[in-house]
From Swiss-Prot:
GO terms for biological process: rRNA acetylation involved in maturation of SSU-rRNA; tRNA acetylation; tRNA wobble cytosine modification. It comes from Haemophilus influenzae (strain ATCC 51907 / DSM 11121 / KW20 / Rd). Catalyzes the formation of N(4)-acetylcytidine (ac(4)C) at the wobble position of tRNA(Met), by using acetyl-CoA as an acetyl donor and ATP (or GTP). ATP binds at Q145, G167, R168, G169, K170, S171, A172, L173, L174, G175, M176, R291. Keywords: Acyltransferase, ATP-binding, Cytoplasm, Nucleotide-binding, RNA-binding, Transferase, tRNA processing, tRNA-binding. Signal peptide: none annotated. It is found in: Cytoplasm. The gene is tmcA. This is tRNA(Met) cytidine acetyltransferase TmcA. InterPro entries: Acyl_CoA_acyltransferase, GNAT_dom, NAT10/TcmA_helicase, P-loop_NTPase, TmcA/NAT10/Kre33, TmcA_C_sf, TmcA_tRNA_bind, tRNA_acetyltr_TmcA.
Length: 656
């Protein structure tokens, strides 16, 4: 049986293709809808990459291609591809317009060359031969699948982890397992359309429940989980708090997840999950591909292109009590193309520097001796990020390679990357009118996540004008954690020519204590829990310059002043000094922006409560009723409009 193939076709227009060829892109399945293709198989696929390469969709296409099939990637140019604006950059770069992505294109072309895939110029050269492969022989369990099923059915452990790369028969195993369990079986997954293989192999004798609905049902009808089994497909894509909730009710659970996939679900998920849930575990992994041949060139190409093996290839280094120096150079340079070597540094030193600056040194180094091949150093950096953040995804890879306004700091000791920080430059906005519109909620331009949040939610417009560095990711080798590496990396950042440092994170007590230990103060808690983590978003700041220190001090005092008067669930977790009921300039700004523009109700509640305290509830019957019941008699949108009008009418009267 022939291997699956990738062909690159260089054309300004899409070629005409037979009906049995699936088109992904402008004239077919939208890139954003590609996840709905998971679990299906297609003979041939035409991928429209003329305006940019959507990496996740490309990986999905490769994962759904049948054995012997052809994936044709259409590009508008080849020789000048690195100079063309990539429309996909609008998803991951903060700019308002598309940018060229020379570093990714260099990496992409290297991978194409490595696997000798053809570059075609004529439409007639593309071939979509009939594929005679059938997966009927995989309807029965393989030996590896049957052994895992038998082990799970013995039910000697509480929780089972099943991992596999795509195309290994993981979904089929879940379905066949459900057939043999002599108890009720429930299935949940983040995407119902992707589990039809599980349902097919279970012969329909399994009930699917969406993750949120399952959690709600467990809270209202906990008895339904008694004696039942739960199968969780693509578990790493479901927030950990929900998985923890499931584990409190079901005696036996099988958590299944794809490793080395477009979703960015690394092996770190299992380790992180085990630290959260204290139950007995057993892990199984399917390794033999079933839907294509061993050593399939297309699979290897996707693995290399998306650096899917970077996590496994990362070299862990045992901790030793070394004496090291800290060097900091945060000159912001563009990420060079990946070639060359890193010059040798002083033996035994721990070097912390801006990654682009360090990689710039690779280009200018005249010596041939070096401790790192740059391609491998880049893989190490990405691998370390994947270990620490199991949802590191192809989107992050694209941003890492070509994103603008980035700075990278790393700790390295004798050819081993110990820790790293990935930071983004923010602020330094000069358009006063735009800043006013951000504060009013009229505009939300791309980028500047923390400055815009502080401006809109906390009325701190100065945050947009000052220069700041936001820590996007921080990672330290597992063996070197709790050794001060992370704090030392952040100390090096303090030499940057900015006014303050910031970080946005999913709030947990553990993370809050870590950032506090690093000198940051909490200044914002989001209204809603993040879907990805189940945590409330939080913002913490650390002042650097005189202006930055003043901003952080104001932000912290406002946060401490307003949180006790908010309805945030965490308000009771923080020390509450004497409540401040006096209306200040920030409060009046909040009220005006709520009444006349788009300030949120949640952010305005402290100011509204102070207004009612001083002006009397009789002037605000609607607001008083809402603050008492914390709900609207009508739908929320109309209810908020009524509250805005009540505040607006009062402000227009100009009386207190």
């Amino acid at each position: 049986m022939p291997s699956r193939q990738l062909q690159i076709l260089i054309r300004k227009t899409l070629p005409l293709v037979p009906d049995h060829v699936l088109i992904i892109g402008e004239s077919g399945i939208a890139f954003s809808k590609a996840t709905n293709l998971l679990g299906q198989e297609f003979e041939h696929i035409l991928f429209d990459g003329r305006n940019g390469i959507h990496l996740e969709a490309l990986a999905i296409a490769a994962g759904t291609l049948k054995m012997g099939g052809t994936l044709c990637l259409v590009l508008s140019d080849w020789e000048n591809l690195s100079q063309q604006p990539d429309q996909d950059s609008l998803r991951w770069n903060g700019n308002q317009s598309a940018i060229a992505t020379p570093n990714f294109i260099y990496h992409f072309k290297q991978c194409i060359e490595r696997y000798h895939f053809p570059i075609l110029r004529e439409e007639s050269a593309v071939e979509f031969p009939t594929v005679f492969y059938s997966n009927e022989h995989h309807k029965n369990a393989t030996l590896a699948q049957q052994q895992i099923i038998e082990n799970i059915l013995q039910a000697e452990q509480d929780i089972y982890f099943l991992t596999a790369k795509r195309g290994r028969g993981k979904s089929a195993l879940l379905g066949m397992l459900a057939n043999q369990i002599q108890a009720p079986v429930y299935l949940t997954a983040p995407n119902k359309s992707a589990v039809h293989s599980v349902i097919e192999f279970s012969e329909g004798d399994i009930e699917f429940i969406a993750p949120d609905e399952l959690a709600l049902t467990l809270q209202t009808e906990p008895e339904f989980s008694q004696s039942a089994w739960l199968l969780v497909d693509e578990a790493a894509m479901i927030p950990l708090p929900l998985l923890q909730e499931y584990s409190r009710y079901f005696q036996h659970i099988v958590f299944s997840t794809t490793i080395h996939s477009y979703e960015g679900t690394g092996r770190g998920f299992e380790l992180k999950f085990k630290r959260k849930i204290h139950r007995t575990f057993q892990h199984f992994e399917l390794k033999q591909p079933l839907r294509w041949q061993e050593n399939d060139p297309l699979e290897h190409f996707i693995d290399d292109l998306l650096l899917l093996n970077a996590e496994d290839d990362f070299q862990h280094f045992d901790y030793s009590n070394i004496t090291y120096n800290i060097e900091e150079n945060a000159k912001n340079l563009s990420f060079p193309c990946l070639r060359g070597k890193v010059p040798e540094g002083p033996k035994g030193d721990l070097d912390i520097a801006s990654l682009p600056q360090a990689l710039e040194a690779l280009l200018t180094s005249k010596g041939s001796e070096g401790k790192y091949n740059r391609q491998f150093f880049f893989r190490d950096f990405y691998g370390l990020m994947t270990i620490a953040h199991y949802r590191t995804s192809p989107l992050d890879l694209r941003r890492l390679l070509d994103g603008k306004n980035q700075r990278f700091y790393f700790a390295e000791y004798q050819q081993n990357l110990l820790g790293a920080i990935w930071a983004l430059e923010e602020g330094n906005m000069a358009d006063d009118e735009l800043i006013i519109q951000i504060q009013q909620g009229k505009r939300r331009p791309k980028g500047n996540l923390v400055p815009q949040a502080l401006c809109f939610h906390e009325n701190l417009s100065q945050a947009c004008k000052l220069r700041s560095l936001r820590i996007s990711r921080i990672a330290v080798q597992p063996n070197w954690q709790q050794k001060g590496i992370g704090q030392n990396l952040m100390q090096a950042m303090e030499n940057a020519d900015v006014d303050f440092l910031s970080v946005s994170f999913g709030y947990t007590d553990e993370l809050a204590k870590f950032w506090q230990k690093c000198g940051f103060v909490l200044v914002h808690l989001g209204e809603h829990q993040e879907a990805s983590s189940g945590c409330y978003s939080a913002i913490a700041l650390k002042g650097i310059s005189k202006e930055g220190l003043a901003l952080v001090d104001t932000a912290y005092k406002q946060f401490q002043r307003n949180l006790p008067l908010s309805f945030h669930p965490f308000a009771i977790n923080f020390e509450q000094n004497q409540l401040d009921w006096q209306l200040d300039d920030f409060d009046w700004m909040s009220l005006k922006n709520f009444a006349n523009f788009h300030r949120t109700l949640f952010s305005s509640i402290p100011a509204m409560r102070r207004l009612l305290k001083l002006a009397g509830k009789e002037n605000f019957p609607l607001i008083s009723a809402y603050l008492t019941k914390k709900q609207f008699p009508i739908n929320k949108k109309k209810g908020v409009e009524c509250l805005r009008l009540e505040i607006k009418q009062y402000l227009e009267r100009g009386t207190l």
